[in-house]
């Protein structure tokens, strides 16, 4: 049990990415099929939050010296903010769009700064996902209304690029890293 909690960054980030991809696929399929997960959705949200934090915290070591130290330290800060915003929104209907607007900029930055670390297709997916996050969460934050509807096909594109850019890209980069 101790080994699970005290593992190296690479292994922890890989496990977080697998969980992130799995939870997002479950949500994506459930959304398309209009499934109601009930209270299990709270469990999925918890796993999603922890997996996303694991991915974000691992980016510091994955990117290494390709980004400045203040950027690397910023990953811990955004991971904490995303975790708090995500978990606060589990049982309460809170407006967390401000935090996720900022997170959209972080995803965009990940795509732009990870050249040579994450393969281009996954970097571009992160850039697209970041732009979607900025537009969707930003419009909700500024106007109170998201310009991308919840049941819009364009939201599926944003979600798939989010899974690819934030989940698959770093996972494959970690798999290649010695």
Give the location of each predicted region:
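Hydrophobic, aromatic-enriched alpha-helical segments typical of multi-pass transmembrane helices
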Residues: 1-178
């Amino acid at each position: 049990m101790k080994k699970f909690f005290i593992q190296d960054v690479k292994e922890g980030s890989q496990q977080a990415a697998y969980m992130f991809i799995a939870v997002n696929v479950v949500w994506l399929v459930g959304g398309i099929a209009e499934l109601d997960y009930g209270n299990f959705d709270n469990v999925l949200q918890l796993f999603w939050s922890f997996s996303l934090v694991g991915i974000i915290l691992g980016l510091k070591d994955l990117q290494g010296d390709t980004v400045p130290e203040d950027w690397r330290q910023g990953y811990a800060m955004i991971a904490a903010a995303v975790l708090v915003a995500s978990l606060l929104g589990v049982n309460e209907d809170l407006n967390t769009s401000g935090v996720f607007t900022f997170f959209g900029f972080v995803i965009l930055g990940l795509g732009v700064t990870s050249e040579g670390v994450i393969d281009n297709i996954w970097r571009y997916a992160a850039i697209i996902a970041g732009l979607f996050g900025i537009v969707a969460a930003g419009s909700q934050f500024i106007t109170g209304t998201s310009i991308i509807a919840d049941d819009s096909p364009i939201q599926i594109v944003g979600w798939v690029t989010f899974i690819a850019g934030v989940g698959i890209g770093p996972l494959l980069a970690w798999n290649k890293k010695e």
